[in-house]
Swiss-Prot record:
It holds the Pfam family Toxin_3. The keyword Metal-binding does not apply. It comes from Centruroides exilicauda. It is found in: Secreted. This is Neurotoxin Cex2. Has the structural arrangement of an alpha-helix connected to antiparallel beta-sheets by disulfide bonds (CS-alpha/beta). CDD domains: neurotoxins_LC_scorpion. GO terms for molecular function: sodium channel inhibitor activity; toxin activity. InterPro entries: LCN-type_CS_alpha_beta_dom, Scorpion_toxin-like, Scorpion_toxin-like_sf, Scorpion_toxinL, Scorpion_toxinL/defensin. GO terms for cellular component: extracellular region. Residues 20-85 form the LCN-type CS-alpha/beta domain. The modification Cysteine amide is found at C84.
Length: 87
């Protein structure tokens, strides 16, 4: 029983440590989602937790939305081959 508990705890830690994080980015423009209220930010948190993003928590960092616990399929800044505002 103790072994099963330890294995479960280790798997939970591995999932937490290896979760993806980064700046939320627009797939069409390659630009970060902007924000102006630094720290805890309802807008960033809502965007990060949106079903199409799948994140666990979001806040405003350096005037852009930073997301934690993202699935690997969610793109984060920078997107290879896309420069924000440059053609």
């Amino acid at each position: 029983m103790n072994s099963l508990l330890m294995i479960t705890a280790c798997l939970a830690l591995i999932g937490t440590v290896w979760a993806k994080e980064g700046y939320l980015v627009s797939k069409s423009t390659g630009c970060k989602y902007e924000c102006f209220w630094l720290g805890k930010n309802e807008g960033c948190d809502k965007e990060c937790k949106a079903p199409n993003q799948g994140g666990g928590y979001g806040y405003c960092h350096a005037f852009a939305c930073w997301c934690e616990n993202l699935p690997e399929s969610t793109p984060t800044y920078p997107i290879p081959g896309k420069s924000c505002g440059k053609k």
